[in-house]
Amino acid sequence: THGKMQTIFADTISFRPQFEEGLIQQGKVKSIKRPFNDEYQRLKKLEISSRETEKFIQICRDNGLVPMTTCFVREHVNSLASLDFKSIKVASYDCASFPLLNELADKFEEIVVSTGATFDDEVKFAAEILKNTNFSFLHCVTLYPTPLNQMHMARMDWLRNFTSSVGYSDHSLVSETGLLASKAALTLGAEIIERHFTILPHGDTRDGPVSINKVELCELSNFSK
């Protein structure tokens, strides 16, 4: 299995007016509210150095895990490849970042792409770019947390039209539904389950409510066997 970290730096984010107050049109959220200054300060505290990244890679390998990271910008492709990552993750909002996919396809042995917030034609084009690589598609609903009645697990069947390796990125609310969504996805044939992981109480961090702890991770791992 894999251990994944995020590679993102505060200096790479850009100011976009629509995020300062958010944008809602006809009752639908077009842009979330995420002011630049608040986001910059949040990400600055979470930055991981190259030395810390190298330590993460070594700890993963020492424990039989495949180290992986998410690449958010093209400027980081070469540096991540030089750190000896063999596997790379692409976030949902970058499934349609086709220049990024092209560069990743040349640098990494395994590419895992989340497909939330992506139109069907964009998924098809991404698959065309990656067709000569070892790639997987993850079904993902970009709603945090994701209610059980909006999981749309049947989407995995459609994704199998493009690759045999299909999985599910689970952002369900752990306190209410536990591991039910992840287990359902496995039962439906998912080869990959992506979950956020925490060693802190679920309410202590921004993504804590959708993160699993070590006990829940062991339960999920045992179920998958």
Residue ranges and their predicted role:
Residues 1-225:
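Catalytic cores and adjacent flexible loops of soluble metabolic enzymes
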